[in-house]
């Protein structure tokens, strides 16, 4: 398909979106064909939907006020200091790491990103963080905090959690067989889910004693 035809398709689809997103079609076209991008275009006020776009990287200085959808995009790296005001969707990504200074105001969804090995110390996850089935993940940063829920289910190579881990919502550790204990100072603002894991060897009281001076606000599901 000719480049002109692809651009016309982008432009046509963009006309059907809300006015606040009207410049994003041009940005998507430039990203797809690796064209130069202005500073103004790097500041996206609304959502930026790049789902399925065959790109491997994003430009430095990109800021998205709404959601950034990169599912099925073949993305291999993200720029340092990337800021997303809404959700950052990276389901089934090929990312091996995340950049320093990444800030996500909504949900950071990395479900099934099986090449991801670690998270940066400077990551700010203000909403939910979905790391379910990130099978290469081996650790979390010391003093890590998640504003919402944290899903670590099916993270088979995760063998420990850092002391002082804070989770604003519920914590899922279903079938994370590598975990044989929980750290001191763990705080969970919601419930704890340990179904089909080695943590079911401990009683509820033993788990709550194990994490002191930490605390689990909700129930423990086993």
Predicted regions and their residues:
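Concave beta-strand-loop units of leucine-rich repeat
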Residues: 29-31, 46-55, 65-75, 85-95, ...
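The feature encodes a structural signal of leucine-rich repeats
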Residues: 37-39, 55-59, 75-80, 95-100, ...
